[in-house]
């Protein structure tokens, strides 16, 4: 695999530590072009920006982190080269879509956009000042931004919405919000997912019960036609599948791909329960 940021034709020697242009002259002057120097300077500034982001995760929004994540991947990996995550992997889908949207964007452009975004996040950032390295100074593959996005990010309390509280299984907050009519129990996010979808995806059985008691639409479908039953089945939460069925969930509803809930699970026990229930309704 070509070494990033080296001019065309440059390779690493057998020792891995010396550059070779393909001849035995050992003359490196050809590499000292203005273009090569500019690329090297940009790469160094990019690495400093990536290190600085480690301290900005708490103040950056989800959208800003995704923006940075996509450009980091474009620089380090290149064009998006992995399959789209499964429908129930919300976080993975968002990251994949952000990266995929960059298309054939060059590493140079991605680095410039990344650096500009960091400067916008922290106008007072001085690249000449070395970053302090703590226990998190080395974050492994992907760098600071990628690492933070591969885990549930910490969201400031004032920035949380009802779906964040649902993800956290904060039953008390959600119950109060619904009863005070601050939120509609059937409100959906940008993907058409209702609170019930989220609760089923995360395996929060008690929250599912609360939402059903608050008259959540049990057969509500998201933008891909999937119901809460699809989510519970796909995530193999058999107890939630049974709870939904007992509460009137329809196992005959298909998603946009034509799949029944029993067809999106890898668990034979869950699939069998759904098949038997569907047969009983026939």
UniProtKB/Swiss-Prot annotation:
Keywords: ANK repeat, Cytoplasm, Lipid-binding, Nucleus, Phosphoprotein, Repeat. InterPro entries: Acyl-CoA-binding_protein, Acyl-CoA-binding_sf, Ankyrin_rpt, Ankyrin_rpt-contain_sf, FERM/acyl-CoA-bd_prot_sf. Disulfide bonds: none annotated. ANK repeats lie at residues 191-220, 224-253. It is found in: Cytoplasm; Nucleus. The keyword Flavoprotein does not apply. Pfam families: ACBP, Ank_2. The modification Phosphoserine is found at residues 41, 106. One of its GO terms (cellular component) is nucleus. Gene3D superfamilies: 1.20.80.10, Ankyrin repeat-containing domain. Monomer. This is Acyl-CoA-binding domain-containing protein 6.
